[in-house]
Amino acid sequence: MKILYKVRHPNGVRTIYFCGLPLWSYNSHNRSRRFRRLKQRVFIFDDNGEHEIFYNYQLPNNIHLGGGGTNNIIRIHKTLRARNVCLTFDKNTSDNICVLCDSGDCSGLDMIVIFQAGHANKLYIGRHTVINGAKIWLGNGSELHLGDDCMLSYEIMIRTTDGHAIMDSATGEIINHQRNACIISNHCWLGLRTIVTKNAQIPDHTIVACGTVLTGKFTNTHTIIAGNPGRVIKTGVSFSDKSIFDLENI
């Protein structure tokens, strides 16, 4: 068995191994540039299985990891189309799970995800979902489930926690715990500058108007929600990912 050896990777990358364990990597075209070992556990998967990656250069294009924490797990489908996706973990986080597209025909994502202090947060993003610009905050053991075939516009804010505690002034008891998972179900359209707060849940085939603040749980499908706080303003509707022009000229 070799004690110290080098493995060549594509694009000029070299990894030095000691007793079978990777020590560090560098670019043979620019030896001053060393590659960082990932602090999180990252798995790339497809229908044939998954494999773990260990260095930042192995990440899919335009996906960036930052922060600290321990034992956080990220699963990324190999067909994911990403644009400037940044996942940041607070130094006090642990045991968080992030799934970016669970199978083939994957989403197109342009977003920033921040895991605040806390443990066992869960983020799940389904298939055929497009996010054009969103900031997502998770914390305190919360969960966000974003379903299949969704469209999210620009400047979307989703927070599964308030972040700071609100207490009863007499007893000191914290009164703003999140109670339920935050759920955006299948085939939902979130308009420009939608804000989704903790405990918010919307069912399949929901349209959310620009600037709406989603709070609480909605149960009726095929609706339009608008306002602050959001309320149902129209029923019996659906939407298409095609433009009006495209549909009128089929």
Report the location of each language-model feature.
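Amphipathic helical hotspot of TIR/SEFIR-family domains
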Residues: 207
